[in-house]
């Protein structure tokens, strides 16, 4: 089928020698800015018109600019599955089944892209868009389940985050398609929750903004637009993104990846040169992500989706709702956790709220099961190439190693209160930043190269030095001499020295005054209770905490017990009945629409739908 837009772009690519992938993606990323200038001026109450505009522009991107008919089919299949199963399947397993289908569909396309799809200069892979969509669809299923399929008593037990993201009624099909195919984030993200999208679409998120901050309508005197002006900030994001894009192109030209694969050239250079060359490769490879995420964030800011509240004290507007990268923190982070929290931030949130906390049994803290599922989901979501798994597995070990060093070294450079830094902490911070950059430059090489043998060859060219350091650290702090090593570092920590002196003093007082000793004993017991840290997910790459993996057997026994209990309650038969009812509801709604007037068809597609809470029988 003839595509006039593709024909023009192909001619430009041929005549000027421009890279097809770069040109088409640049048009989609930068083209969203003039489109958003139009979108934000559509009257607030014309929700249907906004949705039609969003979907139309996405279709123009997919069919016209990218020439991805099969790509649209891929995205549409996942989107409609989530829409239909969440609308008709009333079961506590609905979010789980949706997650399995969406991630399974993504896995099939990852495998197809790796083994069967022949990439040419005129084709663009759709899996990156599907990765963004997978986050949207799986989080929507959980949000809808929380808001519409739980009883009032169960809703009260949800966390504040779950309550704030809960979707009370099933959205109209048009609005859901606009959410799934939002053109500004279609290709590179960031992902965002349906609750945020709906609040933006209805302009409810701007309710806290003073009227004086809302611009006047040019053609309607006396009326104000809900979305505040933000053109300068959006333009600044574009400038930053273009700068990162240029730096990425120049960097890859002067520091090519193929040089580290040169068996005759790269290994002959000094070890110091090699480890710093790997650092530069990792640094330059991040530029393209900085470019894409910064530009897409600017696009979301321009249309108003990036609005995150008004600060009445500073009288400034926050525009970081969909922020996906904190570049400064990534490049100056003093520890692994800090760096990972600032990288791909919305994916981190998705892993935490849609995987890590969801697989945790109610009433228990996250443990082995949560860590394992999050690790596998994070790696599998990226793809099936061996390089991803090498990077994630090494990263997990390195993050654990980093926590060990931070726990033992950092307190040495803090005063007795454990907070105020000593003058020498600046040296600790600089060494930490330098070590993290070198380590990440080493770890991300398989992520860049992707294939197994070349990745191992590059690591071998620097003698697997990060792996050796990690292994030695585990031996030192987890091996037979762990107690002595830990005790040595504690003896150098000002806070620990102060605590030991304090305890000795309290012990002496307790011996001389029994009554006062009882009070001091109660105080010590109280402080022990306060030191227990809340179980938190390590964003990005879950660490391999060996002591926490000891409860794997307990988790497995709990799972077997739950499954046996579910089976004894005829769980399989109940779910078969739920699926049958879902199909009957589906047929009933469409048969009613087909036999009714055009208004009934319109109502089916454009009105909300909210089922009753799931009954005990349906569970």
Curated annotation (Swiss-Prot):
The modification Phosphoserine is found at residues 513, 605, 610, 615. Pathway: Lipid metabolism; phospholipid metabolism. The chain crosses the membrane at residues 20-39, 52-72, 93-113, 232-252, 275-295, 430-450, 457-477. The active site is at residues 146, 297, 382. Its EC number is 2.3.1.23, 2.3.1.51, 2.3.1.n6, 2.3.1.n7. Residues 592-619 are annotated as: Disordered. Residues 1-19, 73-92, 253-274, 451-456 are lumenal. It catalyses: a 1-acyl-sn-glycero-3-phosphate + an acyl-CoA = a 1,2-diacyl-sn-glycero-3-phosphate + CoA; a 1-acyl-sn-glycero-3-phosphocholine + an acyl-CoA = a 1,2-diacyl-sn-glycero-3-phosphocholine + CoA; 1-acyl-sn-glycero-3-phospho-(1'-sn-glycerol) + an acyl-CoA = a 1,2-diacyl-sn-glycero-3-phospho-(1'-sn-glycerol) + CoA; a 1-acyl-sn-glycero-3-phospho-(1D-myo-inositol) + an acyl-CoA = a 1,2-diacyl-sn-glycero-3-phospho-(1D-myo-inositol) + CoA. It is a multi-pass membrane protein. GO terms for molecular function: 1-acylglycerol-3-phosphate O-acyltransferase activity; 1-acylglycerophosphocholine O-acyltransferase activity; 1-acylglycerophosphoethanolamine O-acyltransferase activity; 1-acylglycerophosphoserine O-acyltransferase activity; lysophosphatidylethanolamine acyltransferase activity; O-acyltransferase activity. Keywords: Acyltransferase, Coiled coil, Endoplasmic reticulum, Lipid biosynthesis, Lipid metabolism, Membrane, Phospholipid biosynthesis, Phospholipid metabolism, Phosphoprotein, Transferase, Transmembrane, Transmembrane helix. Changing residue 382 to D: Abolishes catalytic activity. Its main location: endoplasmic reticulum. Residues 40-51, 114-231, 296-429, 478-619 are cytoplasmic. This is Lysophospholipid acyltransferase. The lineage of its organism: Eukaryota, Fungi, Dikarya, Ascomycota, Saccharomycotina.
């Amino acid at each position: 089928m003839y595509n006039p837009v593709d024909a023009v772009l192909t001619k430009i690519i041929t005549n000027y020698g421009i890279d097809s992938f770069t040109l088409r993606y640049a048009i989609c990323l930068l083209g969203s800015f003039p489109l958003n200038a139009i979108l934000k001026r559509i009257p607030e109450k014309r929700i249907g018109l906004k949705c039609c505009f969003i979907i139309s522009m996405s279709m123009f991107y997919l069919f016209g600019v990218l020439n991805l008919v099969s790509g649209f089919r891929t995205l549409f299949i996942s989107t409609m599955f989530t829409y239909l199963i969440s609308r008709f399947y009333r079961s506590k397993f609905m979010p789980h089944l949706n997650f399995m289908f969406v991630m399974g569909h993504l896995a099939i396309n990852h495998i197809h892209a790796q083994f069967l799809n022949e990439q040419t200069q005129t084709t663009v892979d759709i899996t990156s868009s599907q990765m963004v969509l997978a986050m949207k669809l799986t989080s929507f299923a959980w949000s809808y389940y929380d808001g519409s399929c739980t009883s009032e008593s169960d809703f009260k037990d949800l966390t504040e985050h779950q309550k704030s993201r809960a979707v009370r009624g099933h959205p109209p099909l048009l609005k859901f398609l606009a959410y799934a195919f939002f053109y500004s984030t279609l290709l590179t993200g960031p992902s965002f929750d349906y609750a945020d999208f709906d609040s933006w679409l209805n302009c409810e998120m701007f309710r806290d903004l003073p009227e004086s901050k809302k611009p006047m309508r040019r053609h309607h005197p006396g009326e104000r637009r809900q979305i505040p002006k933000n053109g300068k900030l959006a333009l600044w994001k574009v400038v930053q993104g273009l700068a990162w894009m240029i730096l990425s192109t120049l960097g890859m030209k002067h520091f090519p990846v193929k040089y580290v694969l040169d068996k005759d050239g790269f290994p002959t250079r000094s070890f110091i040169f090699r480890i710093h060359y790997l650092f530069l490769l990792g640094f330059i490879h991040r530029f393209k992500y900085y470019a894409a995420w910064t530009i897409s964030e600017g696009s979301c800011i321009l249309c108003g989706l990036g609005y995150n509240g008004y600060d009445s004290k500073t009288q400034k507007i926050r525009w970081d709702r969909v922020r996906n990268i904190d570049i400064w923190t990534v490049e100056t982070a003093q520890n692994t956790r800090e760096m990972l929290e600032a990288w791909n931030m919305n994916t981190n949130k998705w892993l935490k709220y849609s995987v890590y906390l969801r697989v945790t049994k109610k009433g228990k803290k996250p443990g082995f099961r949560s860590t394992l599922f999050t690790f596998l989901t994070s790696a599998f979501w990226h793809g099936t190439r061996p390089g991803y798994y090498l990077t994630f597995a090494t990263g997990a070990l390195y993050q654990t190693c980093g926590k060990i060093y931070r726990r033992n070294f950092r307190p040495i450079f803090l005063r007795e209160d454990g907070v105020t830094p000593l003058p020498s902490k600046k040296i600790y911070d600089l060494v930490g930043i330098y070590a993290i950059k070198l380590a990440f430059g080493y770890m991300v090489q398989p992520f860049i190269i992707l294939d197994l043998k070349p990745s191992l060859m590059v690591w071998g060219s620097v003698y697997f030095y990060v792996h050796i350091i990690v292994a030695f650290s585990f031996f030192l702090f987890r091996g037979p001499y762990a107690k002595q090593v830990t005790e040595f570092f504690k003896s150098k920590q000002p806070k620990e020295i102060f605590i030991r002196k304090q305890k000795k003093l309290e012990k002496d007082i307790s011996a001389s005054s029994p009554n006062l000793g009882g009070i001091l004993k109660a105080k010590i017991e109280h402080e022990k209770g306060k030191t227990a840290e809340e179980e938190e997910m390590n964003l990005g790459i879950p660490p391999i905490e060996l002591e926490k993996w000891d409860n794997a057997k307990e988790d497995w026994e709990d799972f077997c017990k739950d499954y046996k209990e579910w089976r004894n309650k005829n769980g399989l038969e109940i779910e078969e009945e739920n699926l049958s009812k879902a199909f009957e509801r589906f047929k009933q709604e469409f048969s009613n629409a087909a036999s009714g007037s055009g208004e009934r068809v319109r109502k089916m597609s454009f009105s909300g739908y909210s089922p009753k809470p799931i009954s005990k029988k349906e569970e």
